[in-house]
């Protein structure tokens, strides 16, 4: 019996896989537990169409991320911070300040997509990493100045 898995099943397959199982396992366990459906011709056609739509959606997301990455390549950021007389910042610069500065430039990015490799405690030039997509990661330079 062939079934289409609706979720990942250990030692059998992943979601949307078409697998062959014994009749009893399919009828008595997988289908009643809503882990699979019978793989009829119509179910296979619906699955194929859903997979095509998912691929189109993922391509659009990746294209949008690439467009945003190209836009971000031309942006330079300057972040002001309160400092002591010898140039040490009170507090530190985090991804929140970088996200706020990008928002001022007209680019809305979630702060969880921004990562800084080091703690920024002094005035100077640094880089932040933006993970826009699993395949698109860019570094944005920014400068910290005294207010």
UniProtKB/Swiss-Prot annotation:
One of its GO terms (cellular component) is ribosome. One of its GO terms (biological process) is translation. Keywords: Ribonucleoprotein, Ribosomal protein, RNA-binding, rRNA-binding. GO terms for molecular function: rRNA binding; structural constituent of ribosome. Transmembrane segments: none annotated. Pfam families: Ribosomal_L9_C, Ribosomal_L9_N. Belongs to the bacterial ribosomal protein bL9 family. Binds to the 23S rRNA. This is Large ribosomal subunit protein bL9. It comes from Azobacteroides pseudotrichonymphae genomovar. CFP2. The lineage of its organism: Bacteria, Pseudomonadati, Bacteroidota, Bacteroidia, Bacteroidales.
